[in-house]
Amino acid sequence: MKKHNFYAGPSILSEYTIKNTAAAVENFAGMGLSLLEISHRSKEFVAVNDEARALIKELLDVPAGYEVVFMGGGASMQFCMVPYNLLNKKASYLDTGTWASNAIKEAKLFGEVDVVASSKDKNYTYIPKGYAIADDSDYFHFTSNNTIYGTEMRKDPDVKQRLVCDMSSDIFSRPIDISKYDIIYAGAQKNLAPAGVTLAIVRVDALGHVDRPIPTMLNYATHIKKDSMFNTPPVLPIYAALQTLKWYKEQGGIAAMEKKDLENAAILYDEIDRNKLFRGTVAEEDRSIMNVCFVMNDEYKELEDEFSKYATAAGMVGIKGHRSVGGFRASLYNAMPKSSVEALVACMKEFEKQH
């Protein structure tokens, strides 16, 4: 039976990415060597690294003055790197979930942090609006998509301050006005590659203005200067990222990804809203296109374990909700085929008939 992969991350990758990466593990670029054993300094891998970064610039329409870098450490290291490199006196942060809260905690090590608004009062089930950002903030940091709670900000905030964003789980799912941002960062394991590489898009002239020494590995300038090769890069994830980027381009680019993602999410949300057994967990206007969170209606709560087993038997993988929310979560990243979403919906309908 074909499995339908709804894991929140590491998550589904396109067949194109998996097949090409698997072939390269056997024999990379006709070298007679595995991708797992080549030198990262070989001209063949340098070409991969360069092409991947160039494709990111092309797909996201990155303007002049920005550089794309690959690093290790995940988004969690970026929580530290951003304030290390940008925070002089004060930064503003929006608290919309666990990962935003973790970023705030790290930033407080480097200066004053103004949490302009938080949705913690309602277990992060909405995106705050109408907040004020101090004029003297060095930057405004937000998390565009909240994988645990299923909320998302799908538009670039219209504020005068420079933006910094954790786009780990929705980058490449919509057009972005990069010119509004100082830094965009993203762990790869949702919409790009296997875990192990982190992407950052950095406005070069935003760097070099803080009054503190920055450790070499935590300085964005280090990685920009060395073309993401300051230390040995994660070769396999970068190669897989290139395959994903090629697939995005082949599919029609970011606009095509957005159209498909919106359609997939609508199919599932429509069923959640129709089905007597289920309900969504977040404000409708803030529903994530990437991570659809839902629970059993109160009168059917006792069926939760039964549905989980039923869905698993039907080939659904990874729909258990995060422990802090409970219920279910279906992650619909860019590689998610419509057929898998339709299979989950059919499963929900059939379970409803039985109850």
UniProtKB/Swiss-Prot annotation:
EC category name: transferase
Listed Pfam families: Aminotran_5
Cofactor remark: Binds 1 pyridoxal phosphate per subunit.
An example Gene Ontology CC term for this record: cytoplasm
Entry-linked InterPro entries: Aminotrans_V_dom (IPR000192), Aminotrans_V_PyrdxlP_BS (IPR020578), Pser_aminoTfrase (IPR022278), PyrdxlP-dep_Trfase (IPR015424), PyrdxlP-dep_Trfase_major (IPR015421), PyrdxlP-dep_Trfase_small (IPR015422)
Associated pathway: Amino-acid biosynthesis; L-serine biosynthesis; L-serine from 3-phospho-D-glycerate: step 2/3; Cofactor biosynthesis; pyridoxine 5'-phosphate biosynthesis; pyridoxine 5'-phosphate from D-erythrose 4-phosphate: step 3/5
Origin: domain of life: Bacteria
Chief place where the protein resides: cytoplasm
Regions that span the bilayer: none
Residues the record lists as N6-(pyridoxal phosphate)lysine modifications: K190
Catalytic activity reported: O-phospho-L-serine + 2-oxoglutarate = 3-phosphooxypyruvate + L-glutamate; 4-(phosphooxy)-L-threonine + 2-oxoglutarate = (R)-3-hydroxy-2-oxo-4-phosphooxybutanoate + L-glutamate
Subcellular location: Cytoplasm
Any GO MF annotation of the entry: pyridoxal phosphate binding
GO BP of this protein: L-serine biosynthetic process; pyridoxine biosynthetic process
Positions with a binding annotation for L-glutamate: R41
Keyword Cytoplasm: yes
Alphabetized UniProt keyword annotations: Amino-acid biosynthesis, Aminotransferase, Cytoplasm, Pyridoxal phosphate, Pyridoxine biosynthesis, Serine biosynthesis, Transferase
CC cofactor: pyridoxal 5'-phosphate
Binding site residues for pyridoxal 5'-phosphate: A75, S76, W99, T147, D166, Q189, N231, T232
E.C. numbers: 2.6.1.52
Purpose of the protein: Catalyzes the reversible conversion of 3-phosphohydroxypyruvate to phosphoserine and of 3-hydroxy-2-oxo-4-phosphonooxybutanoate to phosphohydroxythreonine.
Family membership noted in the UniProt record: Belongs to the class-V pyridoxal-phosphate-dependent aminotransferase family. SerC subfamily.
Subunit structure: Homodimer.
NCBIfam families reported for this sequence: PRK05355.1, serC_1
The protein, known as: Phosphoserine aminotransferase
Record organism: Parabacteroides distasonis (strain ATCC 8503 / DSM 20701 / CIP 104284 / JCM 5825 / NCTC 11152)
